[in-house]
């Protein structure tokens, strides 16, 4: 449910920014700042990277996923410049605005998940016993977060 809401917000954010800034593209009459392609891809692949980081995949596979996400965003950003569809600042603005929006959304989702977990019976405090091989150890209070 997060992805559709996030991408719909990305489209709205890009339209508002283009309307507010009203800067034309290099060779076109349409608005150019920020680059909608870059903004959308930063949000989408940034979310994929965030989800990948919390996955149970082996580290080499996660790094392959990170590299694929980064390469896609960079390739599209370069293509926007190469095709003279945007100025460098349009692409940088799309990247910056997309990253800010993504970080805000991740913070919001994590905050809501923590609140929901704290309100549920499974989110109560639990005691964890940490012990070494010989049975020596200590009790540690921790909060169990169920997402």
What are these regions (language model features)?
Residues 26-34, 38-135:
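Membrane-embedded catalytic cores of phosphoryl/pyrophosphoryl-handling enzymes
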């Amino acid at each position: 449910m997060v992805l559709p809401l996030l991408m719909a917000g990305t489209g709205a954010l890009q339209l508002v920014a283009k309307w507010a800034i009203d800067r034309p593209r290099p060779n076109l009459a349409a608005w150019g700042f920020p680059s909608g392609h870059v903004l959308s891809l930063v949000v989408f692949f940034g979310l994929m990277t965030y989800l990948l980081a919390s996955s149970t995949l082996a580290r080499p596979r996660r790094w392959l996923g990170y590299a694929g996400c980064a390469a896609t965003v960079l390739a599209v950003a370069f293509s926007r410049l190469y095709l003279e569809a945007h100025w460098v600042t349009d692409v940088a603005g799309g990247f910056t605005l997309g990253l800010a929006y993504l970080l805000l959304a991740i913070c919001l989702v994590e905050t809501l998940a923590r609140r929901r977990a704290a309100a549920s019976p499974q989110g109560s405090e639990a005691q964890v016993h940490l012990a070494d091989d010989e049975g020596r150890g200590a009790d540690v209070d921790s909060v169990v977060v169920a997402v």
